[in-house]
């Protein structure tokens, strides 16, 4: 991948001179720890959990210092386990980022300057809104997660610079999502040890190791889009067409059995974007036709599975308007009213304390909790990322071999999802943003090594 600017290249084991980065790394770790402690409250977790967490943190720290990429791989392996906040993935990536700061691997210049500025401004507005918080402890905990996830996006932009790392991320993301989808779908119809944990909240809806099917379903979509593009045009995952097709089918079935209308919208928008973009390139009509045939086969397989398990009636019910939709829209109206009463916002994480149910919209939450200015900054960040994703496609840029077309499609799906579900604390949203930012740092007209070596023409 093309190097950034003319600055000296840091080797993976290079250590910075002096103490500033060490202090910054320690400060990050302490800030995240403080947010976790405040969020857990005065009682804290049981002693056994605390000891296990401490041992786990020390193990991850040792791993990150000795085998940095292996620690990152561990983070992606547990990306699909988010029952509480902070989640296991947060502990792993927080330690990885702290080590990256100390060892000079975390370079903010690897992300666009505008992204860093908008992230910093949004966090500052979150901090300002804390003055209005009715529960300062929850505000501190919620803000610490937002800050960590913002940094995760910026770190991702600098990490995925090589094809080896991009391939590792792609394999782990697709593999983790596919295994989660397979186990969660099977758990709906077959009892096995731990199966109840995979659909604990709703008997008829798969939720994986998330708290809500509306988070689990959308988690599978980017992986499905990435493997779909690899199936049509192999770049990082050579061979194994049948395995890719199986993974795609399992992921589509997983999205279906989440019975999340937002997840269905997410996948539908992403697929439509791919269908719109693929014909713009040479040979794109043929690939778009192959895409349609592949999707027909996958959805047909998912439909057969739904009918065979006797779930077709439930699928039809879920596709209709639900009785609780009125409550959700009422809560969103309440969010607008909160913004009118509190111009600076009511503070991070306060929406559920002031309204009967969650915001069910990233934008309504931002409006209520950070005010009009906070919403404007967040929208600017999301739309600028969308603009960069479109530009990456038109200029033929990819992120170390990761298709800019697939990244654009997945991002559009997430944006559509964000109107109906609060996505601010979704780990894969910020990772996806980081991957798009990384691609934008290529020079105009530049193409990744993977694209040029395989004869790929823009847009990618």
Enumerate the language-model features and the residues they cover.
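Transmembrane alpha-helices of multi-pass inner-membrane enzymes
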Residues: 31-33, 95-100, 268-272, 408-415, ...
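N-terminal hydrophobic segments of proteins, predominantly signal-anchor/transmembrane helices
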Residues: 62-150, 402, 414-415
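A membrane-periplasm/extracellular boundary helix in multi-pass inner-membrane enzymes
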Residues: 16-18, 182, 186-191, 257, ...
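A juxtamembrane structural motif centered on a specific transmembrane helix
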Residues: 2-26, 30, 395-400, 433-460
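Loop-to-helix entry and N-terminal half of a specific, functionally important transmembrane alpha helix
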Residues: 247-249, 390-420, 436, 440
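Membrane-embedded alpha-helical segments of multi-pass membrane proteins
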Residues: 47-57, 85-105, 143-152, 216-224, ...
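Long extracytoplasmic/lumenal interhelical loops at the membrane interface
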Residues: 194, 310-372, 391-396
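Alpha-helical transmembrane segments of multi-pass inner-membrane proteins
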Residues: 29-33, 56-61, 97, 120-128, ...
């Amino acid at each position: 991948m093309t190097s950034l600017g003319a600055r000296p290249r840091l080797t993976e084991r290079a250590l910075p001179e002096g103490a500033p980065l060490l202090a910054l790394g320690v400060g990050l770790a302490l800030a995240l720890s403080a947010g976790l402690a405040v969020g857990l409250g005065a009682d804290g977790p049981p002693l056994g959990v605390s000891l296990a967490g401490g041992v786990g943190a020390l193990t991850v720290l040792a791993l990150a210092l000795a085998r940095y990429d292996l620690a990152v791989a561990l983070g992606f392996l547990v990306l699909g386990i988010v029952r509480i906040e902070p989640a296991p993935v947060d502990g792993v990536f927080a330690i990885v980022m702290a080590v990256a700061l100390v060892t000079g691997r975390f370079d903010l210049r690897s992300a666009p300057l505008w992204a860093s500025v908008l992230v910093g401004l949004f966090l500052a507005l979150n901090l300002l809104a804390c003055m209005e918080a009715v529960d300062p402890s929850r505000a501190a905990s919620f803000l610490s997660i937002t800050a960590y996830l913002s940094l995760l996006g910026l770190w991702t932009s600098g990490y995925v610079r090589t094809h080896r790392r991009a391939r590792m991320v792609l394999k782990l993301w697709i593999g983790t999502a596919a295994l989660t989808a397979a186990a969660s779908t099977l758990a709906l119809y077959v009892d096995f040890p731990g199966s109840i944990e995979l659909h604990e909240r709703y008997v008829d809806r798969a939720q994986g190791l998330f708290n809500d099917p509306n988070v689990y379903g959308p988690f599978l979509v980017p992986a499905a889009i990435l493997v779909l593009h690899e199936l049509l045009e192999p770049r990082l995952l050579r061979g194994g067409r049948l395995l890719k097709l199986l993974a795609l089918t399992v992921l589509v079935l997983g999205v279906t059995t989440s019975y999340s209308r937002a997840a269905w919208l997410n996948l539908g928008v992403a697929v439509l974007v791919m269908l719109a973009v693929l014909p713009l390139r040479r040979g794109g009509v043929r690939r778009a036709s192959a895409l349609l045939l592949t999707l027909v086969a996958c959805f047909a397989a998912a439909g057969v599975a739904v009918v065979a398990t006797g779930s077709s009636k439930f699928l039809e019910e879920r596709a209709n308007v639900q009785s609780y939709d009125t409550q959700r829209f009422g809560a969103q109206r309440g969010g607008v009213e909160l913004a009118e009463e509190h111009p600076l916002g009511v503070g991070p994480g306060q929406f559920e304390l002031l309204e009967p149910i969650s915001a069910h919209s990233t934008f309504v939450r931002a409006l209520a909790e950070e005010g009009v200015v906070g919403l404007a900054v967040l929208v600017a960040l999301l739309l600028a990322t969308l603009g960069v994703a479109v530009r990456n496609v038109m200029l033929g840029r990819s992120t170390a071999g990761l298709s800019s077309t697939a990244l654009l499609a997945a991002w559009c799906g997430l944006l559509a999802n964000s109107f109906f579900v609060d996505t601010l604390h979704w780990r894969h949203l910020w990772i996806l943003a980081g991957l798009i930012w990384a691609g934008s740092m290529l020079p105009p007209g530049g193409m990744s090594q993977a694209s040029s070596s395989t004869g790929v023409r823009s847009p990618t």
